[in-house]
Amino acid sequence: MSMKRDRGFSLLELLIVVAIILIIATIAIPSLLRSRQAAQESSAVANVRTINTAEVTYLSSNQGAYGSIPELITAGLIDNRFTGSVSGYTFTVTASGTTYTANASPTSTNAGRYGYFALPDAVVRWATTTSATCSPCFPTGQSGNGVQ
């Protein structure tokens, strides 16, 4: 009669491994979420700059008038992804003749901590979001904090 040797892991060993995995996940997940949020905010700033460039081009070819997002799309200056949510942000342009405001509002509080906007001076500014719609975060005029 030969003795059969048990193979495998004990319940205690499995519980220790699961506990270690949970500890690592608890540390890593918030960091990953912050990284994703920072990437979405950087993308929003880049997209506002893209809209600024499109507005300058549109202005020079349309008798000194700025255009809305649909007008910029029709002119072929930006693509139609700006009609919806892009990287967690919704983009709007309010154009009235010789001025415009390009806004980037986070679609949720997880998408970004800041809303971004630009005026004809092409400086991208940020304002802290106070709600998911970011309606009060865009001041009128030249106020706001410049983005580096």
Features from the language model and the residues they span:
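Extracellular/periplasmic head regions of type IV pilus-like filament subunits
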Residues: T53-V123, S143-Q148
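Aliphatic-rich helix starts adjacent to a transmembrane/signal segment
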Residues: S31-V48
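N-terminal single-pass transmembrane signal-anchor helix
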Residues: K4-L32
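Extended, polar beta-sheet/loop recognition surfaces of beta-rich domains
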Residues: M3, E41, P70-E71
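Nucleotide phosphate-binding site architecture
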Residues: P30-L33, L59, R125
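Conserved catalytic core of two-component sensor histidine kinases
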Residues: V18, V45, N52
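A short, surface-exposed interaction/processing loop segment used at functional sites
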Residues: A118-Q142
